[in-house]
């Protein structure tokens, strides 16, 4: 009875305290929309010693901005107040900074959860309420945190299936050979819990792809974990919270381990005797389970030689070739607690050479969407062909009922023969790497059997399926889109259906090519070519949350760097990336136009997100690489290096190299000029005054040398250009053209496009990125529209009309060929679509206040476009611009996030006609401080504006 009275009193007290807190809520127009740590919501496995806090505020009214913030961090929720916060109390900090605010509290401990919240004040000193409590959990901060966890690998390869082998044949081999690769490994162990668990965290580092099981169920929705890396220098672990999934008493843990890129020891060998083994070693895994009990005690359970191991039904797996699954060798319910594993062996401890293990911070690869057959028909050999209607990256899943031992083989391909009668063999991936894209399933013969792969993904639209007794349908076979789960955060739509379709194809081509790295293609190579990566980076940033993705890829580039001799001074050594990162297929040192990705990716991350940490972190490497490229300077002041404007129309490096109109040295030096300016900015940010001055001088010298060497008159005209469309576009984009020559150069570009090329582009990836933006900037927007929408080769509309659903690598006249050549899914050709946001939408981040703290609004569009709607993600919230154009008037609805301002670009005539929210600019300026003038441009504070002016 006394206990009940005490409990009732405590409940009353709790209700009273809660009511008091509710009464203390402020009436405020400042509301938190998002509260993030390291750009994530409630993240686990944080390894930063000084995490970064950010928040997005929704606020009513106009011209609202932050004047101060207050952050609390505590070790528990009950300490998360101003009096008891025991980890960090920032107190009130006078600052407008609301993104990437650096933690300055006590040292954070490994594998520990912390709680935090924030409040802000606006410039009128209006105070917000505290945000809802958030948490973050630290990861394993150094090797000692792994405790006794050992690396384990398969002891015995016991595969006996005759289907463990595949054919491998490169172009240098007369006959194929049989290969099998490393076996997929199955590991299990049990743990008995006799106390109540308060928190349970599992940390798994797979060298090779893995899947994790607990008590008969797969844990999480990740596939193909973890992301690829330079495994000898950097590997990634994944953290799982399994507190709610553990049972009292016995629990069974299971791991299936595949080769991934770590154990890929087949593809990219020149011949059977080649020593180009791209594997790092046999796949291996490390597991640590950290348990905290409700009585306050802790314990660990980890991988070691006591774990049991076996092979199983996955009898072959290769990231390029595919999986082979022999269902006759299934292991039963091997992840359950009551499974008899007495026939299994014991795992072998191993010690792979790895310098660093970190938490995987990028989004995981997941199964994103299923696709049903759109058409099913028989090929010329009588086998069934399935068309899924969309070129995707992923795999197929099967649901079949056939006799025991029946082999079902699925060959995936991007294209049919031009006559449509069969799949095109040249589009199955094997021509490049020696392994055709094939999935194999061998039936156990006991009724309906369902299966999908685990350790490979392909690029395909079509599938030829052999070995089935009935016509395939949606119940039998589906395609599964599998990719890194980058979140789509931006949007674009306009009045032109062709542009909308181009935008969708560009997005598709990117999504298909993110699997822990920005790939060149999802089938033939699966490589992170640096030139491809920077070609489509900005368009990706307009559409997706790529913050962590590109930070991870920068680490891939850094860990891929090799000591390289200087060109002019071979006695000097520089750390230089290779053309490809990460992995053992490196190509050569990164030529200038590819290697500038090392500077561009941090620049874009800074420009679009405003986080200067990546600039500071990679500054030494960027500085060293800049000096390496300066060591190519010739007597004429031009760097004698370059890869070239990849894949212009009709170009083939072996049979038609002349089709590359732009000299590789010219396009490389144009990029390098831009990068010298970026490095000047980076030097200033890093208080490196000497290098800042050096970069300024080198940039000015290169501009002079570039114009002297490459700016020429076009015969029989009054115009000039830089000897190709690409170089001319680059020179205009990067500000290399002398002021007095701009009009002549623009006219020269137009002349070549219209009079010489018949209204077509002749650009590869370097020129494609900027040509439509540049034409729009210099008053030739209608010409940009013409190039894009003409139905004739080589326009984007021609490609779409040819039936492609992603952008092909090469620009050829497809109807004249037996079948499409090379890859049909290359995101380097998506880069031009940044034009839809920066020109049509008119939204660009300011270089003066990065991360869209200030941004430019300046729609530049062709007369054929009458309406455009864009949403651009920023660290402050979404910028939205919805405009329509009719009878010379531009009507715009513009939404500007809290704590930012927009620079509306106008000429004097446009300014004089300007009406904002129904008022002339002059009247509005008298009554509000949220609108100011800067030349003829108008600076707008936050809020939603209705804008109308005569567009000239």
Curated annotation (Swiss-Prot):
Alphabetical UniProt keywords = Cell membrane, Glycosidase, Hydrolase, Lipoprotein, Membrane, Signal
Q: InterPro entries, alphabetically?
A: 6-hairpin_glycosidase_sf, 6hp_glycosidase-like_sf, Alpha_rhamnosid, Bac_rhamnosid6H, Bac_rhamnosid_C, Bac_rhamnosid_N, Ig-like_fold, Rhamnosid_concanavalin
Q: What residue stretch is flagged as signal peptide?
A: 1-21
Binding positions for alpha-L-rhamnose?
520, 524-525, 532, 594, 826
Q: Might you report a single GO cellular component term?
A: plasma membrane
Question: What GO molecular function annotations does the UniProt record carry, in alphabetical order?
Answer: alpha-L-rhamnosidase activity
Give the induction note.
By ulvan and rhamnose.
EC class of the enzyme, as a word: hydrolase
Gene3D superfamilies attached to this UniProt entry: 1.50.10.10, Galactose-binding domain-like (2.60.120.260), Immunoglobulins (2.60.40.10), Maltose phosphorylase, domain 3 (2.60.420.10)
Q: Which SUPFAM superfamilies match?
A: Six-hairpin glycosidases
Quote the subcellular location field of this record.
Cell membrane
Q: Which reaction(s) does its UniProt entry say it catalyses?
A: Hydrolysis of terminal non-reducing alpha-L-rhamnose residues in alpha-L-rhamnosides
GO biological process terms on file: carbohydrate metabolic process
Keyword Lyase recorded: no
Q: How does it sit in the membrane?
A: Lipid-anchor
Q: Cell inner membrane among the record's keywords? A: no
Q: What is its main location?
A: membrane
The catalytic site is made up of 525 (proton donor), 809 (proton acceptor)
For this protein, what is the EC number?
3.2.1.40
The superkingdom listed in its UniProt entry is Bacteria
| Stated family | Belongs to the glycosyl hydrolase 78 family.
Q: What does this protein do?
A: Alpha-L-rhamnosidase that may be involved in ulvan degradation. Ulvan is the main polysaccharide component of the Ulvales (green seaweed) cell wall. It is composed of disaccharide building blocks comprising 3-sulfated rhamnose (Rha3S) linked to D-glucuronic acid (GlcA), L-iduronic acid (IduA), or D-xylose (Xyl).
Protein name, UniProt field: Alpha-L-rhamnosidase
Q: Which organism is it from?
A: Formosa agariphila (strain DSM 15362 / KCTC 12365 / LMG 23005 / KMM 3901 / M-2Alg 35-1)
Upper classification of the source organism reads: Bacteria, Pseudomonadati, Bacteroidota, Flavobacteriia, Flavobacteriales
């Amino acid at each position: 009875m006394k206990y009940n009275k005490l409990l009732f009193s405590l409940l009353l007290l709790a209700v009273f305290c809660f009511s008091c807190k509710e009464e203390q809520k402020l009436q405020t127009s400042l509301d938190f929309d998002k509260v993030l740590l390291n750009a994530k919501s409630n993240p686990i496995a944080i390894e930063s010693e000084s995490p970064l806090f950010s928040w997005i505020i929704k606020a009513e009214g106009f011209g609202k901005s932050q004047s101060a913030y207050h952050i609390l961090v505590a070790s528990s929720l009950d300490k998360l107040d101003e009096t008891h916060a025991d980890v960090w109390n920032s107190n009130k900090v006078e600052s407008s900074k609301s993104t990437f605010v650096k933690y300055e509290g006590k040292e954070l401990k490994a594998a520990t959860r912390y709680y935090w919240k924030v409040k802000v004040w606006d410039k009128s000193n209006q105070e917000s309420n505290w945000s809802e409590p958030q948490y973050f959990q630290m990861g394993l901060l150094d090797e000692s945190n792994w405790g006794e966890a050992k690396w384990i690998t398969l002891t015995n390869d016991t595969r006996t299936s005759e289907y463990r082998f595949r054919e491998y044949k490169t172009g240098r081999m007369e006959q194929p050979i049989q290969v099998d690769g490393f076996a997929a490994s199955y590991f299990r162990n049990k743990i008995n819990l006799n106390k109540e668990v308060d928190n349970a965290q599992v940390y798994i580092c797979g060298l090779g792809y893995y899947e994790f099981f607990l008590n008969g169920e797969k844990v999480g929705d990740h596939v193909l974990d973890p992301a690829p890396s330079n495994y000898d220098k950097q590997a990634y672990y994944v953290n799982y919270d399994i507190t709610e999934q553990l049972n009292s008493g016995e629990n069974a843990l299971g791991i299936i381990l595949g080769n991934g890129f770590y154990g890929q020891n087949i593809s990219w060998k020149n011949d059977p005797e080649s020593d180009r083994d791209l594997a790092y070693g046999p796949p291996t895994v490390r597991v640590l389970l950290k348990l905290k009990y409700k009585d306050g005690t802790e314990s660990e359970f980890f991988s070691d030689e006591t774990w049991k191991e076996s092979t199983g039904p996955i009898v072959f797996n290769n990231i390029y070739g595919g999986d082979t699954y022999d269902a006759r060798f299934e292991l039963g319910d091997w992840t359950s607690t009551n499974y008899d594993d007495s026939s299994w062996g014991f795992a072998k401890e191993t010690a792979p050479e790895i310098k660093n293990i970190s938490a995987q911070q990028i989004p995981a690869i997941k199964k994103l969407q299923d696709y049903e057959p759109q058409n099913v028909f028989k090929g010329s050999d009588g086998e069934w062909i399935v068309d899924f209607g969309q070129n995707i990256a992923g795999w197929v899943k099967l649901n079949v009922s056939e006799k025991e031992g029946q082999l079902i083989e699925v060959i995936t391909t991007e294209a049919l023969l031009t006559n449509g009668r069969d799949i095109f063999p040249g589009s199955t991936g094997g021509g490049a790497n020696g392994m055709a894209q094939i999935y194999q399933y061998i039936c156990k013969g006991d009724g309906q059997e369902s299966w999908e792969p685990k350790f490979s993904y392909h690029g395909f639209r079509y599938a030829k399926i052999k070995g089935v007794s009935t016509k395939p349908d949606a119940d039998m076979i589906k395609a599964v889109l599998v990719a890194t789960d980058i979140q789509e955060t931006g949007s674009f739509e306009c009045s032109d259906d062709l542009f909308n379709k181009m935008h969708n194809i560009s997005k598709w081509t990117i999504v298909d090519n993110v699997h822990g790295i920005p790939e060149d293609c999802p089938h033939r190579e699966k490589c992170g070519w640096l030139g491809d990566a920077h070609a489509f980076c900005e368009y990706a940033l307009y559409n997706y949350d790529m913050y962590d993705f590109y930070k991870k890829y920068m680490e891939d580039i850094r860990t891929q760097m090799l000591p390289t001799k200087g060109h002019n001074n071979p006695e000097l050594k520089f750390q230089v990336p290779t053309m490809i990162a990460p992995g053992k297929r490196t190509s050569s040192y990164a030529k200038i136009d590819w290697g500038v990705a090392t500077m561009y990716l941090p620049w874009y991350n800074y420009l679009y997100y405003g986080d200067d940490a990546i600039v500071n972190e990679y500054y030494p490497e960027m500085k060293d690489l800049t000096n390496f490229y300066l060591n190519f300077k010739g007597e004429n002041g031009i760097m004698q290096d370059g890869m070239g404007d990849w894949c212009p129309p009709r170009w083939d490096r072996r049979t038609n190299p002349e089709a590359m109109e732009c000299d590789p040295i010219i396009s490389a030096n144009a990029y390098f000029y831009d990068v010298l300016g970026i490095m000047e900015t980076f030097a200033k940010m890093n208080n490196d005054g000497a290098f800042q001055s050096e970069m300024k001088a080198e940039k000015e010298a290169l501009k002079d040398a570039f114009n002297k060497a490459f700016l020429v008159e076009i015969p029989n005209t009054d115009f000039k250009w830089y000897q190709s469309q690409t170089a001319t576009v680059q020179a205009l984009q990067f500000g290399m053209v002398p002021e007095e020559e701009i009009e002549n150069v623009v006219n020269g570009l137009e002349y070549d496009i219209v009079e010489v090329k018949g209204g077509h582009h002749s650009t590869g990836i370097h020129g494609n990125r900027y040509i439509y933006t540049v034409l729009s900037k210099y008053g030739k927007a209608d010409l940009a529209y013409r190039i894009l929408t003409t139905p004739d080769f080589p326009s984007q509309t021609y490609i779409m009309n040819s039936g492609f659903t992603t952008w092909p690598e090469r620009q050829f006249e497809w109807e004249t060929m037996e079948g499409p050549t090379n890859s049909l899914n290359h995101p380097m050709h998506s880069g031009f679509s940044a034009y839809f946001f920066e020109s049509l939408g008119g939204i660009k981040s300011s270089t003066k206040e990065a991360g869209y703290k200030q941004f430019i609004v300046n729609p530049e569009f062709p007369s054929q476009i009458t309406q455009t709607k864009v949403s651009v993600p920023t660290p402050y919230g979404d910028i939205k611009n919805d405009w329509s154009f009719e009878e010379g008037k531009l009507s715009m609805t513009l939404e500007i996030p809290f704590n930012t301002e927009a620079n509306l670009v106008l000429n004097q005539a446009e300014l004089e006609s300007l009406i904002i929210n129904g008022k002339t600019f002059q009247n509005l300026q008298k009554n509000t401080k949220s609108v100011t003038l800067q030349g003829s441009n108008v600076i707008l504070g936050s809020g939603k504006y209705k804008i109308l002016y005569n567009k000239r």
